[in-house]
Regions:
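Flanking helices and flexible, charged tails adjoining ferredoxin-like Fe-S electron-transfer domains
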Residues: 30-67, 77, 99, 107-198
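Short, flexible loop/turn segments at beta-strand junctions in immunoglobulin-like
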Residues: 70, 99, 234-236
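Extracellular beta-sheet/turn segments enriched in Thr/Pro/Gly and aliphatic residues
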Residues: 181-183, 260-275
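Short, ordered, surface-exposed loop/turn motifs in non-cytosolic proteins
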Residues: 191-193, 200-217
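Short Pro-Gly-centered beta-turn/loop motif in secreted/extracellular proteins
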Residues: 206, 229-243, 249
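Short, acidic Ser/Thr/Gly-rich low-complexity loop/linker segments typical of extracellular
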Residues: 216-231
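A short, solvent-exposed loop/turn motif at the edges and junctions
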Residues: 245-257
Length: 275
């Protein structure tokens, strides 16, 4: 039965346990015919990257995980001219370390970043194996999943109802590639529009203001309400340009735009005055 991995970026706290566990499992350990030892440095088969988003003081951090996607239509498999790459019955894509001849065609074929690495010392390509050697030994999950303290990593059978429910909430990385990956993400970063509302006459934060962003072109609307600090966050908006309207009963409406939300943006402090 095929395996899938779901990574929930919303609850990942950036502890790096998954990255460390991967190194601990593979550095200095020969798991042939699944994998030869990973080098001490230069390779991260589960690479954590801190994505700092927005502008001060409206900043969010997303901990992104780069890992082999174990695609059902993996471009690396036909690219290898010595047939060193194969897919197991459980869906894991493996580079046979004994058959690999170091031609690096798989590195060129892979459409994802920081997935396949080249080991100069061994003259072979290497990557995540879903810890297939552990699965064959009776483990139910790879080391990275076992090491995750928050439950951000979930691994299991693709037909398991609990896993299916997670996959239904998740999405693949770069879906336009249509390579049918077996790794899914919940909470992939999408743009936000943030700011703060205040009353300059009394130098106070404005709570309860309704902030509406309307996309230029298709008219799609996102709404939020300012909190006790006057802050508002319009999350997961479609990339594009927006007009932003701030309204509160008893106050003059304030409109701004176009706001470029092709990336996360802090529109700053918006002043409102009583009508």
């Amino acid at each position: 039965m095929g395996k899938v991995l779901v990574i929930d970026l919303n609850i990942c706290n950036g502890c790096y346990n998954c990255q460390v566990a991967c190194k601990d499992e593979h550095v200095g350990n020969d798991w042939s015919p699944i994998a030869k030892p990973q080098p001490d440095t230069g390779q991260f088969w589960n690479k954590v990257t801190d994505l700092e988003r927005g502008q001060v003081p409206k900043v969010k951090v997303t901990y992104m995980h780069s890992i082999c996607q174990h695609c059902d239509d993996a471009p690396c498999i036909p690219a290898c001219n010595v047939e060193a790459i194969y897919r197991r019955d459980d869906g894991a894509v493996i580079i046979d370390p004994d058959r690999c001849r170091g031609n690096q065609l798989c590195l060129e074929a892979c459409p994802y970043e920081d997935v396949i690495y080249f080991n100069d010392s061994l003259n072979i390509a290497q990557k995540c194996t879903f810890c297939a050697h552990l699965l064959d030994d009776g483990w139910t999950e790879p080391r990275c999943v076992d090491a995750c303290p928050t439950g951000a990593f979930r691994f299991g059978d693709e037909n398991d109802p609990e896993i299916m429910a997670l996959v239904a909430r998740a999405e693949p990385l770069k879906p336009q590639l249509d390579v049918k990956p077996r790794v899914f993400y919940i909470g992939l970063p999408k743009p936000f529009i943030a700011g703060a509302v205040f009353e300059p006459d009394v130098d106070e934060c404005t709570e309860g203001a309704r902030v509406t962003a309307q996309k230029v072109g298709n008219g799609k609307v996102y709404e939020a309400v300012s909190d006790s600090y006057g802050d508002f966050w319009l999350r997961d908006v479609e990339p594009g340009e927006y007009t932003v309207l701030v309204e509160k009963k008893g106050y003059l409406p304030q409109k701004m735009g176009p706001v470029d939300a092709n990336a996360d943006i802090n529109v700053g402090d918006i002043a409102v005055w009583k009508a």
